[in-house]
């Protein structure tokens, strides 16, 4: 069951993101929380693989729950933004909502921000200047500061990457 759920989630995420050059990010998030964080809960790892399906694809919560169960769906909902809102509102709400997320969702959020900050440092979008990259690091740090403290190794890695990013952007 453990491996089946994770493999099924990988396949589902790949299918849902098939029109996007994107599947590497969800895999990176799941790998980060498993490898660095020592997380082996199949529902958390499956949710990490699926964490952007509600935001970035046509997936509905009912579909996730039917395929992967209530807990996986709850984790994904907990880390998903409401894409109907303007970007600034979504960013502000993500900072505020981080205080209320479950421990499982906090693990996924840490893995997500580690992956995203690493990309912003090493492979930023072409149209992001240094100020935009610094703003992203500041925002990501606020989100993680508000998350429940759940895993020292992931939290330390996030802080190391933020520090590396700030040094690189001087």
For the regions a language model picked out, list residue spans one by one.
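Active-site helical microenvironments for divalent-metal-assisted chemistry
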Residues: 1-170
């Amino acid at each position: 069951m453990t491996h089946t759920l994770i493999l099924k989630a990988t396949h589902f995420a790949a299918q849902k993101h098939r029109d996007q050059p994107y599947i590497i990010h969800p895999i990176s998030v799941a790998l980060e929380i498993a490898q660095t964080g020592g997380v082996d809960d199949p529902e958390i790892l499956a949710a990490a693989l699926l964490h952007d399906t509600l935001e970035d694809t046509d997936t509905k919560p009912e579909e996730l729950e039917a395929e992967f169960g209530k807990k996986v769906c709850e984790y994904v909902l907990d880390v998903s933004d409401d894409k109907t809102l303007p970007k600034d509102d979504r960013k502000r709400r993500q900072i505020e909502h981080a205080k209320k997320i479950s421990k499982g969702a906090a693990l996924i959020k840490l893995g997500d921000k580690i992956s995203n900050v690493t990309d912003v440092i090493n492979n930023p979008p072409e149209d992001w200047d240094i100020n935009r990259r610094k703003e992203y690091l500041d925002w990501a740090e606020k989100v993680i500061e508000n998350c429940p403290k759940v895993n020292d190794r992931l939290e330390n890695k996030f802080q190391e990457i933020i520090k590396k990013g700030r040094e690189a952007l001087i």
